[in-house]
Amino acid sequence: MIKPEILAPAGSFEALTAAVRSGADAVYFGTGNFNARRNASNFSGDDLQRAVDFCHERNVKVHITLNTLVKDSEMSELKESVRRICKSGADALILQDLGVLRVVKDICPDIELHASTQMSVGTLDGIRNLADLGFSRAVLPRELSKDEIKYLCENSPIELEMFVHGALCMCVSGQCLLSAFLGSRSGNRGLCAQPCRLPFTAENGTGHDLSLKDLSLIEYAPILSKTGISSFKIEGRMKRPEYVAAAVMALKNSLSGEYSSENSEDLCSLFSRSGFTKGYYENALGRNMFGFREKENVTSATTSLLKKYERIYEKERAVYRVHFVLSVKSDKKISLTASANDLSVTVLSESLPQKAVNRPFTKEEALLRLKKCGGTVFSFGDADICIDDGLSVSAAEMNALRREALLRLADRLKERAPYRINKANIIFRNRKPNKKPQTYVSFRDTSAIPQNVECDKLFIPLSSKPELFEKYSAGAVLPRGIFGNFDEIVKRLIKSGARYALCNTLDSVAAAKKAGVQIIGGPFLNIFNSVSLSEIQKLGAAECVLSYEMTLKQLTALEGECRRGVCVYGRVPLMLTRNCPVKNGKSCRECGGKSFLRDRKGIEFPVRCTNGFSELFNSRPIYMADRMSEVKNADFVLLEFTTEDKEQISSVLKAYQNGSSPEIEFTRGLLYRGVE
């Protein structure tokens, strides 16, 4: 059994030092603007090279996060960032955006690629898709149960990584728009403002019904290591160095069978939200998973506790046992060879050794000098010593030779074979857009579909009766959450007779492919630039609804052949959750499928459930009927009906036919203001 890697966060150089000296096998951090924690200190310029060298010298791998969506206007900056990272010798890149994937593969085809949890892939066929795209590792969603994790590990063609400690988002990663729509700070762009930690209340709920406790599975590490997981990931690039050190130490202790209540108490004191949860892993969803940062949580980290972990990482940690070969010959310069980790260096004295006047240099004295490796990444292993009789070597000269040898050996440890670095030259073939975009309409509730709907394509949920697909010549909207449910989704899709499917994740793309149904990309594939649009076409999408986070200006400038559309009406799904927030206050029977959460301002956000997942919708629908002339370079527009009744739907459809001004409370979404 291969021991899983301990992968620690590094939001600053001090946190990186804490991770490395506490015993992490690898660290992950961001650089520049293209990472999911843009508010962390991160690393750029000389700091990036310094960080990579620091880690490599200590036999620790470096994974760089490039896991955000990128605008077309940022592509030049992205390419420069990729070149800089690859020149630094980093070991792997963690990616979300399909366009970024293409750019990285063009520039540096040899660097290892990891699929971020932001890609929302949690099925075996989705993981196979990632392998085909060139990923060697996938980071699993936090929402998976132990049985689902075990199944994926047993069958995955690539390495799998999972979170074992840290913050737990309410929403499936990569599927959250709450921060973007409430304040233009996009989680998909590394600037999540965490509005979910503010009061959102279900009827009879906790008052913080979108705020989960932090995850902690560290005590299960020995069991999980037997499943075949390749990497245990600790969340926390915004956390203090002491937190990082404590989490790494606790995970090391757990893997060696030495995990204790002290480890757990320290972690809870350093950072928690009303304690920790194992809910998804144990498939024990419910009210006990929820928690928020109370006053006692904030003040529980004492000075003595912080000092305890500071002492662990403030001193250098020996990583390698060094073997010395010392040769002191009368007719040659003194030679000292130092070897570790299959590397060797040799240093020579400036002059020949002198004849001893009083006491000659001995093996015992040489050993005394060679053993002084403190403050370096080396500890003394052994030594082969050959000294001619009657020679003198001063303590100062011997110490200088040892220091020089260890410095040179440390430099050798930093070295990596350079990557091939190419120019990225992506050329687009453009299509001729329709003079007037086609109209696509999606209905969540099939009983609310008006008679004689005029549209070019009509979508209904996959759970609808097969005769409805035939009646409306409808396409199927595949569920966004299909973890542990993939084969059933494929069977249902085949049985439905749907000719096309709206796919919002790479999991659902894989399901549509398996069912032999035409793929239409959905907005939660997060297609945000011309390159990603081109890449989703290569994956089989005939056309694609663009990300809800794109502006009309970005849409107008978008290049490429793939037919593209934009949502011009509907309540945007702000969250996809595997733990229903409404259940904090009432049962499914009491809910009746028409519940909501209320924020601290009294605004209501509808909640609807399907396929074992809940969706939180925006309080107001996007409305663009009176501004359709401003929607340019789109082949189709999408109207999504979720909470509306038949009469309301008929009224909206008529308004779009007539270009009417709104008579309802509405939003323009992000079509004008965009995201940071």
Task: Enumerate the predicted regions with their spans.
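Glycine/small-residue-rich interface belts in oligomeric ring/scaffold proteins
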Residues: 43-47
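Surface-exposed amphipathic alpha-helical tracts and adjacent flexible/coil segments at the periphery
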Residues: 1-22, 26-37, 49-52, 58-86, ...
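Conserved phosphate-binding/catalytic loop of the ribokinase/pfkB sugar-kinase fold
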Residues: 119-123
